[in-house]
Amino acid sequence: MSHEEDLIDYSDEELQTTDAAATTAAPAANGAQDKKGDLTVSGGRPDKKGSYVGIHSTGFRDFLLKGELLRAITDCGFEHPSEVQQVCIPTAILNVDVLCQAKSGLGKTAVFVLTTLHQLEPVPGECSVLVMCHTRELAYQIKNEYARFSKYLPDVKTAVFYGGTPIQKDVEVLSNKESYPNIVVGTPGRLNALVRDKKLSLRNVKAFVLDECDKMLDQIDMRRDVQEIFRATPADKQVMMFSATLSQEIRPICKKFMRNPLEVYVDDDTKLTLHGLQQYYIKLSESEKNRKLNELLDSLEFNQVIIFVKSTLRANELDKLLRECNFPSIAVHSGVSQEERIKRYKEFKEFNKRICVATDVFGRGIDIERINLAINYDLPADADSYLHRVGRAGRFGTKGLSISFVSNEDDEKVLKEIEKRFEVALPEYPEGGVDSSTYMA
């Protein structure tokens, strides 16, 4: 089988989400015989939730983490764990499986990064931790999180593998015992190709992590890759899955990979709002969008802004238009080469650019702390995508502002779906604008 087929780019808006209900098979005749990784969804109520250690910490020291990790946490400026970290970390470090839903920006990534680094006893030439996510940018970001939290753990080696780059470079890293990673982060297509070609050995994996798990398990082809990789790992490993959105349909599928997991739903489906985020919409025609966007960028105070559009073509055209209007922007989408995408991501992350035009490739998990304005130039197709998009502003409980353009009947339907799903009434953007103190930290 060619690598071209293996390295499908799952990361952009062209990927159509399959109906989760359609993937639900008939209940198994004997649930007790189900194996981890068996994707036949049993009927009935979910299994009893795993017990967990309740803790109300005032600091990360209460988790009894390695001293090297505590030093790195202090260097990063973190003083108090978030709610999801307080609930998950004390149990996760005891090797318990974890299924966690929590809003964007509440520190889910740090849960599995700190947990796996605390547990890790690196052995040269062995991969002990495997982390998968659905986009290259998110994989790159997770790798960087491992780098900053492992700064005082010099023996820990981390590598990131994803499609769009020459696979030979990955093979070279894996062929050298000196560079062989203890922690592997990557996208399912590339990782499955490396495993199938016997370049990456997973026989020593002790922790198996899926970030934005619903995005991967919703897609038939990506789920197949995840399942193949899962079966190449030992049966007694720890499994952790995280997302901002976990529907009732996807939860049983996730739990098929686990044994009596700790289930953490920091907010239920109707309360997945984002604290500190001011949310508005503007009704206008398609032809009025550019003028209105120009007005907003001129009048609003912001640190960095991300502008979401529905296609790569529109991203390129809008980016070009903004630069012609003297707004220094960049565009990030799947049509850009991998090397260029990472370069642009770093430019934006390092505050060299303040305006980013993006498709849904930037809609999940990407954590850039200075973003405090998100504009839906094109509304997404559903409420979940809306939540992930606007969650780029107001990360980790900080203030932020989101504005959505509503230009047709489909947009109005999505707006109503958002209001119904999250039990909020989105107000129309006021004619006089908004006070910057309500969204500027």
From Swiss-Prot:
Query: What's the Enzyme Commission number for this chain?
Result: 3.6.4.13
Q: Does the keyword DNA repair apply?
A: no
The principal localisation class reads nucleus
- Determine if Nucleus is one of this entry's keywords: yes
Q: Where is this motif: DEAD box?
A: 211-214
List the catalysed reactions: ATP + H2O = ADP + phosphate + H(+)
Sequence motif Q motif, location on chain: 58-86
Q: Name one GO cellular component term.
A: transcription export complex
The source's domain of life comes to: Eukaryota
Positions of the Helicase C-terminal domain: 276-437
| UniProt subcellular location | Nucleus
State a single Pfam family of this protein: Helicase_C
Helicase ATP-binding domain: which residues? 89-264
- Keywords, ordered alphabetically: ATP-binding, Helicase, Hydrolase, mRNA processing, mRNA splicing, mRNA transport, Nucleotide-binding, Nucleus, RNA-binding, Spliceosome, Transport
Q: Where is the signal peptide?
A: none
Instruction: Mark out the compositionally biased spans (Low complexity).
Output: 19-29
The record's listing under SUPFAM superfamilies reads: P-loop containing nucleoside triphosphate hydrolases
User: Which EC class does it fall in?
Assistant: hydrolase
One of the record's GO molecular function terms: RNA helicase activity
Which positions in this protein are listed as binding ATP?
A: 102-109
Q: What this chain does, per the record?
A: ATP-binding RNA helicase involved in transcription elongation and required for the export of mRNA out of the nucleus. SUB2 also plays a role in pre-mRNA splicing and spliceosome assembly. May be involved in rDNA and telomeric silencing, and maintenance of genome integrity.
Q: Which family would the database say this protein is a member of?
A: Belongs to the DEAD box helicase family. DECD subfamily.
Q: What is this protein called?
A: ATP-dependent RNA helicase sub2
Origin organism is Aspergillus clavatus (strain ATCC 1007 / CBS 513.65 / DSM 816 / NCTC 3887 / NRRL 1 / QM 1276 / 107)
Q: What is the lineage of its organism?
A: Eukaryota, Fungi, Dikarya, Ascomycota, Pezizomycotina
